[in-house]
């Protein structure tokens, strides 16, 4: 990986921890030349690991951007949440789905998104379900 402050520099991992509850890895990295230290959080991309089973036997890939937009559209009542919380909520949904052992379907994505939104903002959950 390259350094965030010096893109021409390579880095090395000096410390690493896996989460026990989520599919995420925390890594402390250090630039080899400058010694600058920074932290990264690595998580699997659902689009590369689980195909979405569509009706009729076709498959599609998970699209985080599409999910972010559909979540943002649920926050008509809260523009701040639409702008700043949609990404984090979509990533929460993606983590939940990546830990789920079942087949990934549009209905499963919608249900997981609805439950996540309801926990965060009940009105947004209702708007999403509508």
PLM feature spans:
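Short linker/helix segments within small regulatory modules
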Residues: 17-26
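Charged, amphipathic alpha-helical regulatory modules used
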Residues: 42-130
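Cys/His-rich microdomains that often coordinate metals
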Residues: 7-11, 38
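Short metal-coordination and nucleic-acid-contact micro-motifs, chiefly zinc-binding Cys/His arrays
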Residues: 1-2, 7, 25-27
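Short metal-binding segments enriched for Cys and/or His
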Residues: 30-48
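A structural signal for short, hydrophobic beta-strand segments that form beta-sheets
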Residues: 13-15
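Acidic surface patches and DE-rich sequence motifs
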Residues: 19, 31, 54
């Amino acid at each position: 990986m390259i350094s965030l402050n010096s893109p021409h520099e390579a880095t090395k991992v000096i410390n690493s921890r896996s989460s026990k509850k989520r599919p995420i890895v925390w890594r402390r990295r250090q630039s080899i030349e400058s010694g600058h230290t920074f932290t990264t959080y690595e998580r699997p991309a659902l689009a590369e690991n689980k195909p979405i089973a569509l009706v009729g036997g076709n498959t599609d890939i998970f699209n985080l951007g599409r999910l972010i937009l559909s979540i943002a559209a649920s926050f008509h009542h809260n523009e701040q949440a639409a702008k700043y919380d949609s990404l984090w909520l979509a990533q929460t949904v993606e983590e939940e789905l990546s830990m789920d052992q079942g087949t990934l379907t549009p209905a499963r994505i919608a249900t997981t998104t609805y439950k996540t939104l309801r926990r965060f903002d009940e009105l947004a959950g209702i708007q999403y379900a509508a």
